[in-house]
Amino acid sequence: MGRSLLHRALTASAFVWAISSSASAQANAPIIGRWDLTVRGADKPYPSWLEVTLSGSRTLVGRFTAGGGSARPISRVEFHKGVVHFAIPPQWDAANGDMVFDGTVAGDVIDGTITTSAGAKEKFTAKRAPLLRRTSAPVWGKPDTLFNGKDLKKWDTFGGTSNWSVVSGVMENAKGGANIITRDTYTDFKLHVEFKFPKDGNSGVFLRGRYEAQIEDDGGKEPILVSLGAIYGLLLPNENPTKGPGAWHTYDITLIGRRVTIVLNGKTIIADQTIAGITGGALDSDEAAPGPIYLQGDHGPVSFRNIIITPAMSGAK
């Protein structure tokens, strides 16, 4: 073989080796997985969530949920020698800049800085999210009526001025203001809740205070990731059996670990699917801990009745 051919052959071999080495490194990159963040915001800490996956042989992509809004796609995650970087455009932010994420991975922890769309820098710590796998079927305890139609003794409010009251056996939120939250916390459970929303209404039922089952007047359109029945931004309902504004709807929700089944108005719209992570508006990112049921009241009027929870015997706190 001539020198020219030999040189080209060696160059090609080196290129293939470099590509293969790069692909192998990314396939085993410790950034891959799901991460629960606590971000030290200007006013107070808030939760966020990150997922990084391998696309093809060497490209890292992902999803990110900020303190509010829904999970956003990340077209490319840069990762080299323990350092991670990506940028995503704004979602609900008033500013127009990209949000920039920079961090350093050390084992099951990431420490770093988020630069917001407005240019503010916020430190964060992320921990690898727990799997929440269950090794046996739950043994259900006794049903507990969370709302008795008379008072709100099992509930507290947070996040603004409370407009919640009991009217003719119904828990009503007259206008946008505070959210309402159970005083008790739960791990695995079955939840029955009846709700009614006005035209253009928007609310939600947060499971363990972290995963929002969306309530919305969506006009009966084909389901999307942020419409009625969705786990907000993460799980898509397979149909939309809405009764429309002004009518009573029912949710029957079973949550075991990360696996959720949602029955809306008698139709199973999400069947034993895995919730990847927290949704926008979550109370915290401590996914392994028990959490409350919280009902969203900050978006506007909404009504609830007949709220009954059946906790797993080992799941109630």
Question: Predicted regions: what is each one?
Answer:
Residues 1-11:
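Bacterial N-terminal signal peptides that target proteins for export
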Residues 9-21:
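Bacterial N-terminal signal peptides
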Residues 23-27:
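Boundary at the C-terminal end of the N-terminal hydrophobic targeting segment
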Residues 30, 34-317:
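Carbohydrate-interacting regions of secretory-pathway proteins
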